[in-house]
Amino acid sequence: MSVDQTLYSRTPAAMADPTCAGPAAFTAAGAFSQPDLMAFSLREEEPIWGFDTIAPSMASWQGKMEQQTFCNPNMERGLKNTHVRNGQPTPPPFDDKKLQTPMGEMYPVAQYAFNSSPPEYAPPKHRSSLSEQSQTDGYGVSTRRRKASAIDQCEQQQEREKREKFLERNRLAASKCRQKKKEHTKLLETRFREVSNKKGELESEIEHLRSEVLNLKNEMLRHAQCGDEAIKIHLAQMVRLITSKDTPNRDLVSPMRSPEQMAASTPHGLSFGFDGPMQLPSEMGSPLDQRRDSEQSIMTESSYTFSTDDSFEELINV
């Protein structure tokens, strides 16, 4: 075994610093004594038991560490494991798994050669960045969701307000329609009452006029005994009209007939538009006979008929 392969030849496998030298850094000449070790100042957070792997016989620590600063660990590994076969150096099989640092193994003192303080390890930026990115993405997604939900709520609120306005307009239109219908119904009822009252008034007026006509006819019948020719002719026409209505097939009454003859020929069941049949007195025949027999009456039958028609028209015009 060479000097390079000492007790501390496995330390390069535990070293993770690429600037650190290989097994050549820990030689027998580079061992330091106990007083040199005590010269280093230790921080309170550094474990003291990490220095137990270093032998007290190592010396010239600082000089050897200055030489190993620019050493390449790959070159040291190649020189260490190289064998000469057939005049040519042939490297033996090398397992890279040996270079991996065990989980429970501590770093040696060689790592702290250039600095008295322990190395400060950077936090895992990749993991933190992934976590921060995931948090940022989650925050962005949640923000977008909140915005989308807020927009949906605003749209729903707007739709609700539009529907409420539409329903309010419908209610107002329905109330106006009902109010107009009530007013129209009241107007029709008022008009019906007015027309009904007017109809009643007209009917009462008709009855009043009928009663007046009957009173006038009765008054005329009272004056039938006065001997006035106009009244007699008017009564004769009334009797003729009533007879024609009651008996249309009977011949018309001659106007030359006397009232006594008309009364005798008229049946008692005929109605003259009064409450009862007209009763003519029997005393009317004597004055008429006396007048006809008088010397002053020289009118013939035809002239009497003509004169009576003219006098009746004059009475109507009056």
Swiss-Prot record:
Residues 160-199 are annotated as: Basic motif. The keyword Metal-binding does not apply. SUPFAM superfamilies: Leucine zipper domain. Pfam families: bZIP_1. PROSITE patterns: BZIP, BZIP_BASIC. GO terms for molecular function: DNA binding; DNA-binding transcription factor activity. SMART domains: BRLZ. It is found in: Nucleus. Residues 202-216 are annotated as: Leucine-zipper. Belongs to the bZIP family. ATF subfamily. This is Basic leucine zipper (bZIP) transcription factor atfB. It comes from Aspergillus flavus (strain ATCC 200026 / FGSC A1120 / IAM 13836 / NRRL 3357 / JCM 12722 / SRRC 167). The gene is atfB.
